[in-house]
Regions:
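Enriched for short, Lys/Arg-rich terminal
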Residues: 2-4, 10-27, 44, 51, ...
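Compact soluble domain cores
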Residues: 26-39, 44
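Short glycine- and Lys/Arg-enriched binding-loop motifs that mark or flank ligand-binding interfaces
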Residues: 39, 48, 52
Length: 89
């Protein structure tokens, strides 16, 4: 498992929107990303493996409504979503 961090275009747009709109949530997202890079399957945000059509993906809680969804690949971690609970991947 590599240390590269990539975002889908949608996830990057969501991430940047949080940076502009809500610094408290943006800071929480940044903490989650750091934790994901250190220990992708444990740590803060209640890491949870996803099921069914999202098998292979993991999520962590940003808020009660919002999740960060990611996939750990050989080259590193890919952030899929930084917003609504399990929407599109």
């Amino acid at each position: 498992m590599g240390k590269d961090l990539t975002f889908t275009q949608t996830a990057w747009n969501e991430y940047m929107e949080w940076q502009r709109q809500d610094k408290k949530i943006a800071n929480k997202i940044n903490e989650l990303i750091k934790s994901i890079q250190r220990t992708p399957f444990e740590g803060i945000g209640k890491p949870e493996p996803l099921k069914e059509n999202l098998t292979g993906f993991w999520s962590r809680e940003i808020t009660k409504k919002h999740r960060i969804v990611y996939k750990v690949e050989e080259s590193g971690t890919k952030i899929i979503q930084v917003e609504n609970h399990y929407s599109d991947k």
